[in-house]
Every structure is written in C-alpha cells, then in structure tokens.
A protein has these predicted regions:
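Feature marking long nucleic-acid-engaging regions of large polymerase/nuclease enzymes
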Residues: 163, 178, 191, 213, ...
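Extended amphipathic alpha-helical segments with heptad-repeat/coiled-coil character used for oligomerization
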Residues: 5, 13, 258-281
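Hydrophobic faces of stable alpha-helices that mediate helix-helix packing
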Residues: 227, 231-241
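Non-transmembrane, amphipathic alpha-helical segments
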Residues: 117, 144, 218, 222-229, ...
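Short, charged/polar, low-complexity loop and linker segments
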Residues: 206-224, 239-247
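Internal amphipathic alpha-helices that form coiled-coils
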Residues: 241-269
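Intrinsically disordered, low-complexity acidic/proline-rich regions
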Residues: 1-124
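Long, charged all-alpha helical bundle/coiled-coil segments in cytosolic proteins
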Residues: 104-207
Length: 281
C-alpha cells in the first residue's frame, strides 16, 4: 500500500524519486519511489527500450518457476505442453509457499544494497511469474472454455505482486516488457539496413523466444520477435531526439530519426511474412 504520496512539478517534469514521492509497504517491507526508480535503472538501458539483459533461467530455489513455464507452451517443440493438457494451473498450485518467504528476504537485501545482480534476479522472477500467471489466465480459453481463469494461486500471486511493485511495473501482464522485450534473444549481428524484405524475415526468424504460450517457431514467434527487432531502432530514435531538443545539429539528427522510423516500419512490414495476417482481424 502506498502512503506519503506527493507530486511536485516545480521547474521540471516529475518522475519517481524526483518530483513523485511515496512510500510502499508490502509484505512487511518498506521502500520508496527513489528505490523503485533506481531498480528500474539497473534493469533497463538508458535512452532505449531494451533491457541490459534478456530473461534468464532462475537459480534455485526459484528455478521451479522457470521449469514450469518452459513446459507450458501448447506446441512445445514436438510435444503438447501443460496448457495443451489443461494442467498448468495444477502444476503452479504445487509450488511450495516457502518460496515467497525466501523472495521477501531477497528483496530486503536489494532494498538495503541495490545492485544490478539483485535487480536482475527480481526482474527475472517478475517476468517468469508474469508468464505463468497469464498462462493460467488463458489456459481455459485454449481448452474450449469461454471464460478465462481469474485465480492466481499463492505463492505465485505474491511473487508477481512484490516483484512488480519494486521494479515499477504493473502486476498485470505487460505486452512490452514481458511478451517482447525481455523474453527474446537478439542475435549479435545487426542488419546493415532493412531494405531487403527476405533478409528482414530471416533476421526475425533468427530471434529466439525463451518462453511462449502457443509456439516457439510459428505465428506467435513471428509476431513477438518482429516487434523485438523493431525495438533495436529505439536507441537511434531516442538519442537523436534528445540531441534535437538541445539544438544540436537538428537537420542531421532529424534525418537519423527518420531513418530509424523507416527501418522500424520496414521490419514491421515483414510481420505478414512470419505470422498469419488473419489472426489480427
């Protein structure tokens, strides 16, 4: 629960820890807006929409989250996954409640001494938990029912809520952060340009999703990884926009923004080659 909320807009646009202040009390822990902003800054690259690192398998004892999530995909590399068998919810119910106690201690250590390593662990717990929670939600739909599941069992619900609050994210499934930005592995090599549609398609197909609901190499992979490929242009857009605001070589920087926007659109147009357009009607 938030308390001591204040917003100050004097002389600058407010953000967490600098104009937007509050205290968060949750599961016996206390942290503030400044700590949330610092945690976020340890996870996400500056002047970009990309994280410092992609999602990683969790270490013990949190590896149970990774293990279940990697088995949930409906079309799971030649076999039917947990969602396809309508058994994901039951698997998640088997997670021991003591995992939440361990995570609370982990977060307390981060509050006392926030590091990139501790922030990354929290971010990874959040991402895997979010995938599992949303997998539970949509599991009935995949199995012919008309209503989604509205129940997230403990301790998954607690892990998701605490990890979301301290990273400044919503507990609800985040399209950008969860579905795309942190759950795909970009190749080391970047495209020199995006003028060749076939090369764009090959590049998108080379991006490997780490977790999925429906498939790892079909329509879902194509849709998600197209958007991840597009995000590689974000740094050029943001940095040159900031330079324009500082009246620094405006013409040159506007041309770079135009190029980044063009490349983003060229990659987006490849999506219809890697996923079925009728799915989006």
């Amino acid at each position: 629960m938030k308390s001591n909320i204040s917003i100050n807009t004097n002389s600058h646009f407010p953000y967490l820890g600098n104009g937007i202040e509050f205290t968060e009390n949750l599961f016996g822990l206390e942290f503030n807006a400044e700590l949330i902003q610092k945690t976020s800054g340890l996870i996400w690259q500056p002047n970009s929409t990309l994280p410092y690192s992609t999602l990683k398998r969790l270490p013990a004892p949190y590896n149970i989250l990774t293990d279940i999530a990697l088995e949930m995909t409906v079309h799971n590399k030649g076999k039917k996954g947990l969602i396809g068998h309508n058994s994901l919810l039951n698997e998640v119910k088997s997670i021991d409640g003591s995992l939440m106690d361990k995570f609370i201690l982990e977060v307390q250590n981060h509050i006392d001494n926030p590091t990139r390593e501790s922030a990354e662990l929290i971010a990874n717990v959040r991402c895997w938990s979010s995938w599992l929670a949303n997998g539970i939600k949509i599991e009935p739909i995949f199995n012919g029912q008309k209503k989604a599941c509205a129940f997230i069992p403990w301790p998954l619900s607690g892990l998701l809520l605490l990890s979301s609050r301290i990273t400044g994210q919503q507990p609800e499934f985040e399209y950008a952060a969860d579905y795309v930005l942190r759950s795909g592995v970009l190749p080391d090599e970047e495209l020199d340009n995006c003028d060749d549609l076939n090369k764009n398609v090959d590049y998108i197909r080379s991006i490997k999703p780490l977790v999925a609901f429906h498939d790892f190499d079909g329509n879902e992979q194509g849709f998600r990884m197209t958007h991840l490929a597009m995000e590689r242009t974000s740094n050029m857009m943001i940095e040159n926009a900031l330079l324009c605001l500082n009246n620094d070589d405006i013409k040159e920087n506007l041309e770079k923004i135009e190029l980044a926007t063009k490349q983003s659109n060229q990659l987006f147009n490849a999506m219809w080659k890697v996923s079925e357009p009728l799915l989006y009607n």
